[in-house]
Amino acid sequence: MSTYAIIKTGGKQVKVEVGQAVYIEKLNVEAGQEVTFNEVVLVGGENTVVGTPLVAGATVVGTVEKQGKQKKVVTYKYKPKKGSHRKQGHRQPYTKVVINAINA
């Protein structure tokens, strides 16, 4: 059974495994640098460890592959009979991280 972990980053919880590429909220780290996640909620596998609220001493290490923006989400507001309309777009920034190790 492969080892997995649930980490907290960007206000969300993400399930990760070694070798997996995950898209998370933007981190201020250059592409190619290593990033360590210290907020590990759960480490699963042969022996599952659940944190209260975090697993003590557990870390997840990954390498930043790229920084980017998601596809544009367009919002359009329209008021009938008033000639009023507004169009606005938003592209959420993300960071693609490849998980290298889960240290429990």
From Swiss-Prot:
Subunit structure, as described in the record: Part of the 50S ribosomal subunit. Contacts protein L20.
Gene Ontology MF annotations: rRNA binding; structural constituent of ribosome
Species of the source: Streptococcus pneumoniae (strain P1031)
Described purpose of this protein according to its UniProt entry: This protein binds to 23S rRNA in the presence of protein L20.
Entry's Gene Ontology BP terms: translation
GO cellular component, one term: ribosome
Keyword Ribosomal protein: yes
Protein name: Large ribosomal subunit protein bL21
Domain of life: Bacteria
Family from the record: Belongs to the bacterial ribosomal protein bL21 family.
Gene field: rplU
Keyword field contains Magnesium: no
Any one Pfam family match given in the protein's UniProt record, by short name: Ribosomal_L21p
UniProt entry keywords in alphabetical sequence: Ribonucleoprotein, Ribosomal protein, RNA-binding, rRNA-binding
